[in-house]
């Protein structure tokens, strides 16, 4: 007689009490490398309004080495992930979304970017039961990304230039 050990089924997602992860492609928000602290401050203020940040969320900002210092000084507090090269900031943020068990740790993910490179990871999070919102500058959000998210919010890129003033 043969007995087979049943594979352990994944445990039900524990009650996360509304934990929220906000992942920011700051270069997508400002339209290129963050060269000044003022650009980072403007991005922070605009995102704070559009994504309704209240200080309780875990924020991760992705940038290339070119904007690392300006981003870090202009938006203090968030975790900063840095990678050089083509799509460096995007790839650094993808590592967070894919490799850090986000679906087990957070109920909601807000991605601040319009880049289609995130579509597959966002779709996977949604399939895993995470509520996903994409926040992107108007006219700069890929169709694939919009379709992958539960909700999409766009904002006027000029908000960044004027530090979030409406």
What do the predicted segments below correspond to?
Residues 1-92, 131:
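Domain-level signal for Mg2+-assisted phosphodiester chemistry and nucleotide/NA-binding surfaces
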